[in-house]
Amino acid sequence: LAAGTSLAAVWGMDLARLGPALAQPLRPADVPTTLQQTIRQRSVGNINYRTLATAPGEPYVPRLDLLGKAADPARTARRRSLVYLGHMTDIHIMDAQSPARLEPLSAQSPSTWAGSIRPQDTLTTNVQAQMVAAMNAAAFSPVTGAPMAAVFNTGDSADQHSTLELRWYIDVLDGQSLTPNSGAAGQYEGPQVWEEATYAWHPEDPAGDWFGAYGFPTIPGMLTAAVSQTVESEGLAVPWYAVYGNHDTLYYGAFEIGESLRALALGDRKPALYPAL
């Protein structure tokens, strides 16, 4: 009421006219969401390296089976937005060079330990920065036009209960710059450059690893760039709130962290092959 009175005074408007105008439903915003465009698999099959392509958007589908009757066509003109929120979850920011990452477990059982190493591990902060930009671009609801009030991040922000991973994720959401490197400056130190670690994708030359046989590309300089770059984030434009996930408090999201694991995480050696574990 106070805000409406102030606006009326500033604009020289009759409060009796301004009130009803403010109470009118907002118009849907033209923002980039999956209503406009989606991402689909371009390549055929699920065995080899897969590429992606843009695809048409997906419209809202009224659940008339739940409603039990036809929807009122005039409902779109009467909509009110209780609140418009952004949602992120399972970001899994990774310190890909941490001695506590047990990548060789993948060689023992690729299915059981699928999360121990993935080709994109060094790029998680880049992905999160782009998620922030996409969230900011959707500042107004595509359904009602209501402004975004806040963003909720529902857990698994850090992948391994790591203070560094937690710091990086907070910095990206807050709009701080960072260099995602916990080792020697400008140098990636990990299984993706170790020749004996055939369980990992080697972007410099994947011919000798498991991924090369499935068509994974050669990308020279990728790892050096990943740990040398400064990741710039514009930061979320609205307040954000987070809750705990299992990866935020447990090792690999499953195991209690004891003294031996803590010593491994803070040590200066990193296992390359499964027998070393």
Which residues does each predicted region cover?
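Acidic, histidine-bearing metal-coordination/catalytic regions of metal-dependent phosphoesterases
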Residues: 2-150, 158-243, 249-277
